[in-house]
Amino acid sequence: MTDGRALRPARPTIRIDGQENASLSGGLLELRVDETADGLYACEASFGNWGPRDGATGFLYFDRRALEFGKALEIRLGTESIFRGLVTALEGRFPEGDAPRVSVLAEDCLQELRMTRRTRTFADVSDADVFQAIASDHGLRPDVDISGPTHKVLAQLDQSDLAFLRERARAIDAELWVDDRTLKACARQARNEGTVRLGYGNALRELTVAGDLAHQRTSVKVGGWDVSAKQALEHEATESVVSGELKNGVSGASILSSALGDRKESVAHTVPLTLPEAQARAESLFRRRARRFVSGRGVAETTSALRVGAYVTLEGLGPLFNGAFYVSWVRHLFDGSHGLRTEFGVERPGLGSA
């Protein structure tokens, strides 16, 4: 387990097309790197853009030699990478009373899928087959570890490849991301991005966390129509689908039932065509709600180990909120006033015992 208090670099380093650029690293003014559980990580970096060059004083980076569309941008903390992607935008900033700046915006290679929109169908396929096919369409290596039903037909209707894969991932309770040129997809329980320990008053600077019943349900039922059997079908998911994730905590469904009574949800718009499809969708919907029962956002000392898919063990928060949480989003930040810090979101399905 990584300790968030370990020594870390004072500022990030910038690599362009695989080579460290000392001028950009030294001229970095602001940085933001965003990660989410939906994939498509993004980066925005701003640099000073005025100074001496070639015996004169002027703009440093508007010649598009160092910063250019399509170039590979990597952000590192020491030897660890926190972002790899391609430059998709260049922005000039001309503030009052300050020197000009240039900003680059970059996205990882899921931007290729975001920019490809199609209408097509897949017949007699599993979701894993679809992920592998779309990875192949974009020259990505598939690393897919997902289970689920086989579908008679799946339709991609005027959707980008990314939107379609996100839709399928939600349907089977999977997460999607890329690591360099590898397209990855797996269930949350199978995603292993390591663990980090953060203590309040040490590496954990601040945190707001709550157990909230507003969006909890005691069950979720999904109904549809079995075309071949010509009969209705349904599946009801309950607390049992997250029991393995509670870690001795008390679920939102259990507290909701005892405090306010049963609250059941019926979902009709998904229209599954087989019972396995209905089961996969109902269980996915229940898990997504249940996992957000205890959720929080905080600020911590920056470490490359604090990433989406990792588990963070929070300490010093008392019996209700101590313990392991899943990291659902991360935002690494840097500027001249506050240095490096990381904002992050966490969630888990269980409240600790008082």
Map each language-model feature to its residues.
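Solvent-exposed, acidic/flexible segments
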Residues: 66, 80, 120-128, 154-162, ...
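Short beta-strand-centered interaction patches in the first periplasmic/extracellular domains
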Residues: 1-3, 8, 101, 106-110, ...
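An acidic/polar, Gly/Ser/Thr-rich interaction patch typically located in mid-to-C-terminal regions
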Residues: 33-66, 206-354
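Assembly/oligomerization scaffold segments
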Residues: 1-111
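Ser/Thr/Pro/Gly-biased, low-complexity, turn-/loop-rich segments
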Residues: 85-86, 91-92, 111-124, 128, ...
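Polar, S/T/G-rich
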Residues: 127-132, 136, 160-166, 170, ...
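N-terminal export/assembly leaders
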Residues: 113-114, 131-155
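Short, compositionally biased
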Residues: 86-97, 188-192, 325-337
